[in-house]
Amino acid sequence: PHVVQPFDADSSHVVLYSLGNFVSNQRRRYCDGGLVAEIEAVRHPDGRMSYSLEAVPVWVAMPGYRVVPSEVGDTMALPEAYALFREDVAEVLGGAYK
């Protein structure tokens, strides 16, 4: 759906419903960024699996469709829409947001 949505993750599974946009010309609210997700899967000696998830917000900066990780974006002069995107992602992800 081109927008960041909540995800489910615990030690037994990870479900990502929507990571938003990575590279897109959609400049309206909720569609101007996304998430990069890193999932680590570990198989234990007893056969049990465990998972961990890190999701990093990214902003699609113009011109040139540059994908900017949030920690870099915080140091740049980006449009006001960037700050709004950060707020929206924090609201959607709640405690899972860094």
Predicted regions and their residues:
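A short C-terminal boundary segment appended to hydrolase-like catalytic domains
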Residues: 32, 36-98
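Conserved beta-sheet core of the metallophosphoesterase superfamily
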Residues: 1-37
